[in-house]
Structures are given as structure tokens and as C-alpha cells.
């Protein structure tokens, strides 16, 4: 495969030419966006759209313009994401006349879109490796507090045997346990990829190991069966793509052996209840198949452009007035074939971005660890979306788009280091030709 050059629409000056500007508003936004319990409960809403989410987005965007990073061209990611956002606007307009009450649909699309724009804000705000690392570090800052809230809530409901009362949401007060778990899965896998894939200082290792540990425990205490499957699949992907996979194989097998002993009995009960067989699946799993049948029915009736954004859970389309509980089916039923094609393009370009990144990384580099972890998180996210919607809740998904933006900028910076336009077959194994071309970052 010919790997084309990746460039920015803004020239990045050498480090000695001028100091890189910092997007302090984006740092704060990244830290705060998963902490719904703080800004929803305690920060004022002045009305007229003057709330925390909107004001922070405006501030971060204006400061991003000053940073001079621009958007990276040549990956296809930005273009497909823009199509994805435009498809949402089209679906919103189509759907306004399909339900009796569409109140809140516009705000829902706006909030979801703000999370997606983290992809652009990251690229616009970062012009060098130092800025990239700082922005990632900001995403780790809220994790200890989130774990503290999780532990506090879990202490109030914990029991030996599992009950639905044990499903908590930590800082995601407007969401549920599954969304909380999906955030923890992403954070855990990206941090784990950096921990094993990058040669970093002991300070960084301590921060990454802490993040991995806290988020892994958070996933366990979420009692989300989808998250259990997703994180195991993501870990498997990271191990398979890692250059030290043979060294990690024995510890990984040992962990699988002792994991049932380490996990709380209630979590093991939850894990053992995973099944899609009709005779043994529980009510929660069984209900999803009902929602999916209804979604497929309405998709067949409106195949081209769908029934409209955020419409399926209305009584006009869902007999249970529930969400589809499958992101891919939701895109099809609400946006039709057009939305499905855009989604496939989006999935392909992100997968290709990660594959290209793995092909040219310097062994042991910080960027290599980021792409490695994000590859596992991407697979986990796709799996999680089969049994729910892990892609549209802004508080949960914003950090994923941030990491994707950092991966896009990192790819451009890596090509700038190489000073060439190599013809590379994507291969996670060390590339000797590239290693000879490298210089110390």
C-alpha cells in the first residue's frame, strides 16, 4: 500500500522559532468533561445556551485558533468525520416532522458534535511532541477523582451476590453504568498501550500504571458485561500488535488464571451470565433482540435516509420507547443507507490511521505507545457499540476523539521526523529501513 504524505494546512515552525502556544481552555475542558457530577450540579446555566459545555467549547476553539496547529491533511479522518457531522444535521432535519415532540433533539446533536470536535481541537492545539504529551496528560488528571466517586458509590451498594442495584455511574450522572464502563475501558487500554509500548520516564510509568489500575478496577465494579468482553478483546489486540508480545504472553496467561480469584463474587456472577442463547439469556439481553427487530423493520420502511436523528426511542417507532441498544443499527434506522455508508467510511479511515501509525512508529516511542493503546481501545469501542450506544454520549466519548486527534497530529509529526514519503506496508514489526532513517526526537 502506498502511504501518502501527511501534512498540515498550517506550517509548523521549528521549536526555536517561537514558543508553542498552549490551549489552556482545552486542557480544562479535557479535565472537566467526564465530571458531569460537578458541572451539571454545581456550575450555573445562564440560559440562552450559556452553559459550561457551550462556553468551554467556544473558549477552547478560540484558543485553538491562536495555537496555529491547523488540521492535518492526507489521512481522510477529518473529511469523513465532517461528513458524519453533516449527516447528523441532515438526519435531524428529516426527523423533525416524523415525531410529535422533537424537543431536545437539536441540543442532543449539538452536545454529541461538541465531543466529536475534540478531534479537531487536538490537532489545532498541538504543534509538537511536547504539546501532544501535555494534552494527553490532561486526560489522566480526572481519573483518580472519578475512581474516588466510583468507590464511594460502590461502598453504598456492594453485596456478595449481584443485583441491578449495584449498577452505578460514578461521575456520569446523566448516563449509566455501561457508559461509565466504556469510558474506563478506553482510558485503561490507551494508558496500557503507552505503558508497555513506550520507553518513558519513571514518572510517566507511575502515572500510566496508576491510570491502568484505577480504570481496570472501575471496569470490574461497573458490572457491565459488554465492557468485560470489550476490554479483554482490546487487551488481546494490544498484546498481538506489541513488539514485546512474547515477553507478555506468560504474564497475560497467569493473569487470566488468577483473575477469577481477584474479582468480586458479584462480578464473576455477572461475567458468567454472558450469553446470547435464547434459552439462557436474561431479560436485559433478550430485550435487545426485541429492539433490534423493531429497528430493522423501520429501516426497511425508510431505507435511504432513515427516520431521523434521535427518533427511534419515541412511541411512533419503538413500542417500548427505548433506544436501539446497538449503535450500528441506530445509525441505519435513523440515518438510512446514507448514514451507514458514512459510518463505514469513518470506521475504515480510523482503522487505516492506526494501521499507518503502527507501520512507521519508532520502536519504544511515545507515539508508538499511543497508537498501540488506541488500536485496542478502538476495537473495544466497536465491540461495545454492538450492545449499546457508546459513540454519542459527549461526556463518555470526548476523550476518544481527543486521542484520535492526537494520533492524527502524531502521524504528521512522525512523517516530518522522517523527512521522506516512504512506501510502507503496514507491519507492526520493527522496520529496519525506517530505523536507519530515524533521528532522536
What are these regions (language model features)?
Residues 46-53, 107-112, 172-187, 226, ...:
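Membrane-interface micro-motifs in multi-pass membrane enzymes
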Residues 41-42, 99-103, 157-170:
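Membrane-interface helix termini and inter-helical loops of multi-pass transporters
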Residues 22-32, 85, 211, 355-388, ...:
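Loop-to-helix entry and N-terminal half of a specific, functionally important transmembrane alpha helix
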Residues 1-94, 99-103, 107, 127-133, ...:
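Transmembrane signal-anchor hairpin modules in multi-pass inner-membrane enzymes, especially those
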Residues 160-163, 168-173, 266, 275-293, ...:
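Long extracytoplasmic/lumenal interhelical loops at the membrane interface
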Amino acid at each position: 500500500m502506498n502511504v501518502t504524505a501527511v501534512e498540515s494546512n498550517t506550517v509548523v515552525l521549528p521549536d526555536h522559532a517561537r514558543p508553542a502556544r498552549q490551549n489552556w481552555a482545552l486542557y480544562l475542558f479535557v479535565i472537566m468533561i467526564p465530571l458531569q457530577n460537578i458541572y451539571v450540579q454545581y456550575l450555573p446555566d445562564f440560559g440562552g445556551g450559556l452553559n459550561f459545555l457551550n462556553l468551554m467549547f467556544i473558549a477552547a476553539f478560540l484558543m485553538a485558533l491562536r495555537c496555529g496547529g491547523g488540521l492535518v491533511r492526507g489521512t481522510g479522518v477529518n473529511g469523513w468525520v465532517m461528513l458524519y457531522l453533516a449527516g447528523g444535521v441532515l438526519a435531524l432535519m428529516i426527523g423533525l416532522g416524523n415525531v410529535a415532540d422533537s424537543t431536545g433533539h437539536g441540543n442532543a446533536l449539538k452536545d454529541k458534535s461538541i465531543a466529536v470536535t475534540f478531534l479537531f481541537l487536538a490537532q489545532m492545539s498541538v504543534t509538537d511532541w511536547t504539546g501532544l504529551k501535555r494534552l494527553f496528560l490532561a486526560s489522566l488528571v480526572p481519573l483518580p477523582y472519578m475512581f474516588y466517586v466510583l468507590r464511594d458509590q460502590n461502598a453504598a451498594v456492594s453485596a456478595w451476590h449481584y443485583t441491578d442495584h449495584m449498577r452505578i455511574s460514578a461521575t456520569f450522572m446523566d448516563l449509566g453504568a455501561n457508559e461509565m464502563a466504556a469510558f474506563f475501558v478506553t482510558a485503561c487500554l490507551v494508558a496500557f498501550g503507552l505503558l508497555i509500548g513506550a520507553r518513558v520516564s519513571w514518572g510517566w510509568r507511575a502515572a500510566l500504571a496508576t491510570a491502568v489500575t484505577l480504570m481496570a478496577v472501575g471496569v470490574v465494579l461497573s458490572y457491565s458485561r459488554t465492557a468485560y468482553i470489550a476490554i479483554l478483546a482490546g487487551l488481546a489486540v494490544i498484546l498481538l500488535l506489541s513488539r514485546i508480545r512474547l515477553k507478555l504472553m506468560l504474564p497475560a496467561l497467569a493473569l487470566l488464571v488468577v483473575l477469577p480469584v481477584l474479582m468480586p463474587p458479584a462480578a464473576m456472577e455477572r461475567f458468567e451470565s454472558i450469553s446470547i442463547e435464547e434459552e439462557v439469556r436474561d431479560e436485559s439481553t433478550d430485550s435487545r433482540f426485541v429492539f433490534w427487530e423493531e429497528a430493522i423493520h423501520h429501516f426497511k420502511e425508510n431505507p435511504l435516509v432513515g427516520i431521523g436523528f434521535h427518533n427511534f426511542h419515541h412511541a411512533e417507532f419503538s413500542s417500548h420507547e427505548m433506544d436501539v441498544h446497538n449503535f450500528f443499527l441506530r445509525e441505519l434506522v435513523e440515518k438510512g443507507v446514507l448514514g451507514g455508508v458514512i459510518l463505514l467510511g469513518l470506521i475504515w479511515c480510523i482503522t487505516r490511521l492506526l494501521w499507518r501509525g503502527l507501520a512507521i512508529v519508532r520502536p519504544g516511542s511515545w507515539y508508538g505507545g499511543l497508537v498501540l493503546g488506541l488500536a485496542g481501545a478502538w476495537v473495544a469501542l466497536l465491540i461495545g457499540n454492538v450492545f449499546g450506544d457508546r459513540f454519542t454520549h459527549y461526556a463518555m466519548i470526548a476523550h476518544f476523539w481527543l486521542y484520535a486527534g492526537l494520533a492524527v497530529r502524531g502521524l504528521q509529526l512522525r512523517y516530518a521526523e522522517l523527512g521522506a514519503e516512504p512506501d510502507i506496508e503496514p507491519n507492526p514489526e520493527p522496520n529496519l529501513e525506517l530505523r536507519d532513517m530515524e533521528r532522536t526526537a
